[in-house]
UniProtKB/Swiss-Prot annotation:
Recorded superkingdom: Bacteria
Protein name: Uncharacterized protein MG294 homolog
MF terms in GO: transmembrane transporter activity
Record InterPro entries: MFS, MFS_trans_sf, Sugar_transport-like
Record family assignment: To E.coli YihN.
């Protein structure tokens, strides 16, 4: 009861305008990220609805990943120089228009040649990389951080995450569940004869992106940024360049970036491939795969983000909290991989399906714990107060780089282990992919542990107990 009262009091510290802004930012987040990244984690065997193969979905993801690598750091610069609200508005509108293009291709895919269709998908995913990174990612989190005080940063991100989960549950998960249960009860194979329901699904997402863009523009407050003119632009450019150099020289920030990379595989590759493994190797029912994917992606985020953010605030160190989440996640994924050795042929093993489903959900809970406070770890290293955006840019650049190079690797592995005449990889292929990702998670955990141990030693030497070095300035 005491914890609930404490949480209630913390929530009362947010104004109505701030809460509305965080809810809107949750919607902005979910709709921009949905089509390029999350739908494949909600709808098993997305490739069948698109009319391509499983390894080609990995190729599309790698394309957007490489574009992200090229635009992440410039995105931090833009967020420092231009209005984050206007950048986010532009991101929502442009992503919506591109999503309409995707919906049109889904609707007409049977009348197009497979190569021409895949080339268009490649262009779509590449453009999404620009609209969901260069003008979206850093502006989103800068605006979110401005809606909370220093003490309530994690809770503010938790509220945004909870809103994200609610929006995603209603507009992404429930619609996907209805489509798979009613229009495609036999799975994606049947979509070839009736692509309209899934195309309508994409049109709905595109429409919501347009609506959300205007709500961001009119209802999300933004702190003023430094004004630039012809006399100060050169000086400011030099200052920004110096800030980037300072950021790049911070070895702790590099290690935390690798730590974020290790955490991100839980949100991205594990979320996708473990679901695919349940569906295609353990032969889980289609409806179960959709329910698990939706629950993990959206329901859990709404249910646990605020509480995990509040729990993280109680820890003396955000990095320690993230280390615990990552360590437990590694154990659960290792257990999932070992389950694969219990699958025999094409027979449904309900024990494997049940245990794998539980492990999948548990890793989802831990993953959202990582997502909620992964940027708060910046507060535990010494950086300049004006380097926040560029620091987030470096964290995201390294952390999300796996969407490029790792999906290139998984595409090769998946294709090599795809049996002749099939569109999905084998159980051995899924196990190899999961093992590769597990190694990345272990490396990230090691990097985070090093920073935590060094910070602990430095605090003891200085006679301090507070791991938060930085006084947050979001202006």
């Amino acid at each position: 009861m005491e914890t609930k009262l404490s949480l209630k009091k913390r929530l009362q510290q947010f104004s109505k305008k701030q809460l509305i802004a965080l809810i809107i930012l949750g919607a902005a987040d979910v709709f921009v990220i949905a089509a390029p990244y999350y739908i494949k984690n909600v709808v098993p065997n997305l490739h069948l609805y698109l009319g391509i193969t499983e390894d080609e979905v990995a190729t599309l993801t790698s394309i957007i990943g490489y574009v992200t690598l090229a635009t992440q750091l410039p995105g931090g610069f833009l967020a420092n120089r231009f209005s984050s609200r206007k950048l986010l508005f532009l991101s929502e509108i442009s992503t919506g228009v591109i999503t309409f293009w995707l919906a049109t291709n889904i609707l007409t895919r049977e009348s197009q040649k497979s190569n021409a269709l895949f080339v268009q998908y490649c262009v779509i995913w590449g453009l999404w990389g620009i609209t969901s990174t260069l003008i979206f990612w850093t502006p989103l989190w800068k605006l979110a951080s401005q809606q909370a005080t220093q003490e309530n940063q994690a809770l503010g991100f938790g509220i945004q995450g909870a809103a994200n989960g609610v929006w995603g549950f209603i507009f992404i998960f429930l619609i996907a569940l209805i489509i798979t249960a009613v229009a495609y009860p036999a799975g994606g194979e049947s979509s070839a004869n009736n692509p309209a329901p899934f195309a309508i699904y994409a049109f709905i997402i595109g429409g919501m992106l347009l609506v959300t863009g205007f709500t961001v523009l009119f209802f999300v407050p933004e702190k003023p940024i430094e004004k630039y003119d012809s006399h100060t632009s050169l000086k400011t450019a030099k200052k920004n360049f110096e800030q980037i150099l300072i950021t790049l020289k911070n070895w702790k920030l590099w290690l935390l970036s690798f730590f974020l990379m290790g955490m991100y595989v839980f949100q991205s590759t594990f979320a996708y491939y473990l679901l695919q493994m349940m569906q295609n190797a353990f032969l889980a029912p289609v409806i179960l795969g959709t329910v698990l994917g939706g629950v993990r992606t959206y329901v859990l985020r709404s249910a646990v983000s605020v509480y995990l953010g509040r729990l993280a605030d109680k820890f003396r160190s955000y990095i320690l909290f993230l280390m615990l989440c990552t360590g437990l996640g590694i154990i659960f994924v290792l257990m999932f991989i070992l389950l694969g050795f219990g699958q025999v042929g094409q027979q449904q093993n309900y024990a494997l399906i049940i245990v794998s489903a539980i492990l999948y959900i548990l890793t989802g809970v831990l993953s959202w714990g990582m997502v909620t406070v992964r940027y708060n770890q910046v507060a535990e290293i010494e950086i300049g107060k004006n380097n926040y955006a560029s620091s987030v840019g470096l964290l995201s650049f390294i952390g999300f780089s796996t969407d490029g190079w790792l999906y290139t690797v998984t595409s090769v592995v998946g294709k090599a282990y795809t049996p002749d005449g099939q569109k999905n990889t084998s159980i051995q292929g899924y196990q190899i992919i999961a093992a590769i990702c597990l190694g990345i998670a272990l490396f990230g955990l090691l990097c985070g542990t090093i920073v935590f141990l060094v910070n602990t030693w430095e605090l003891k030497r200085l006679g301090k107990t507070d791991y938060r070095w930085r006084t947050l300035d979001n202006a």
